[in-house]
């Protein structure tokens, strides 16, 4: 038995496995941004996703091939080897143990499962673990106009770039968008967001360097309401050196926004850099402790072999991944679809 299962135990009952085949076959995409998508656009996005995950896929499939070499059945040795593959692919120990337990249950139930079916079983079990993202158009829900997204994350993860690309996607889908530059501690952050505003022709509300971030958020929502905007996206400072300070700052921003839009923010989007692997999980831990994160965006998947971290983060924190960055182009921020992701990552 592998070290991880010896240390953490394997007596915990496996999660229910009912409807797994139905889950893997369900191809529910977000309707947002995809309602008017052509077949050519969908194919192009799929190709971009596969290219973006090339490094992770190549690494993982090589390891799986070695794990089952010379084996025809899924035995304890194969599971030990697979466990090592997943942990070293940045899936994380906790999530890896869950996946292995699920596969053990499948082997017990389907007595004739062999290594030839391992990849398919692995895809199904990982897909069943990933948290499903909402399917509705959030900004078109009754009583949620403007729909307010507060974006959080440390400096350097691609937070402001993600906001710019997200604004572009919302605008392409027909929404009227307003951006708020509430990261007032870095002049570069405000300037970068203003540049994205110019590129996407979306208005940006900003104040002087060092201004109160909550004041910027307040002005942004007032402006959005006056403009009858559909979506507001608020950038925030990315500092983790003081969790209490971070918590207080984000709480203040939320409370001030509620004075203008009582339900705001409707979404708190945490941006994480997939290339940092397990560091991304630690950032998720700190931000989820500081505020009520309810959506994730993973950037830089195209430049790393650590794409497996997406599986661990979504499962460990029970938060859906909504967006993934798979390239430099403005259109390379994609809606996350767990089936497409898993098929691109583990497909043969």
For each feature predicted by the language model, list its residue ranges.
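Non-catalytic terminal/linker segments enriched in charged/polar, low-complexity residues
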Residues: 1-138, 142-151, 172, 176-178, ...
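P-loop/Walker A NTP-binding module and the surrounding RecA-like catalytic core of P-loop NTPases
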Residues: 94, 127, 132-348
């Amino acid at each position: 038995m592998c070290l991880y299962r010896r240390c953490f135990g394997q007596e915990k009952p496996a999660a229910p496995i009912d409807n797994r085949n139905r889950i893997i076959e369900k191809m529910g995409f977000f309707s947002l941004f995809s309602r008017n998508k052509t077949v050519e656009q969908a194919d192009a996005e799929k190709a971009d996703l596969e290219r973006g995950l090339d490094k992770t896929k190549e690494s993982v499939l090589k390891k799986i091939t070695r794990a089952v070499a010379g084996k025809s059945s899924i035995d304890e040795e194969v599971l030990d080897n697979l466990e090592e593959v997943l942990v070293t692919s940045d899936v994380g120990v906790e999530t890896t143990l869950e996946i292995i337990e699920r596969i053990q249950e499948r082997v017990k139930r389907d007595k004739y499962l062999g290594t030839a079916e391992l990849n398919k079983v692995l895809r199904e079990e990982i897909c069943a673990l990933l948290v499903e993202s909402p399917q509705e158009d959030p900004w078109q829900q009754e009583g949620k106009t403007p729909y307010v997204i507060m974006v959080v994350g440390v400096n350097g993860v691609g937070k402001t770039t993600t906001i710019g690309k997200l604004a572009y996607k919302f605008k392409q889908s027909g929404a009227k968008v307003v951006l708020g530059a509430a990261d007032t501690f870095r002049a570069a952050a405000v300037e970068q967001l203003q540049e994205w505003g110019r590129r996407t022709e979306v208005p940006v509300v900003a104040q002087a360097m060092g201004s109160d971030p909550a004041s910027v958020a307040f002005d942004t929502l007032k402006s959005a309401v006056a403009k009858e905007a559909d979506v507001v996206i608020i950038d925030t400072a990315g500092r983790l050196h003081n969790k209490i300070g971070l918590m207080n700052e984000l709480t203040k921003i939320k409370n001030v926004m509620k004075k203008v839009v009582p339900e705001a923010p409707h979404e708190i989007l945490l941006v994480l850099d997939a290339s940092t692997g397990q560091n991304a999980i630690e950032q998720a831990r700190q931000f989820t402790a500081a505020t009520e994160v309810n959506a994730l965006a993973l950037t830089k998947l195209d430049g790393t072999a650590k794409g497996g971290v997406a599986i661990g983060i979504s499962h460990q924190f029970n938060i859906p991944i909504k967006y993934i960055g798979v390239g430099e182009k403005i259109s390379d921020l994609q809606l996350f679809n767990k089936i497409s992701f898993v098929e691109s990552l583990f497909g043969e």
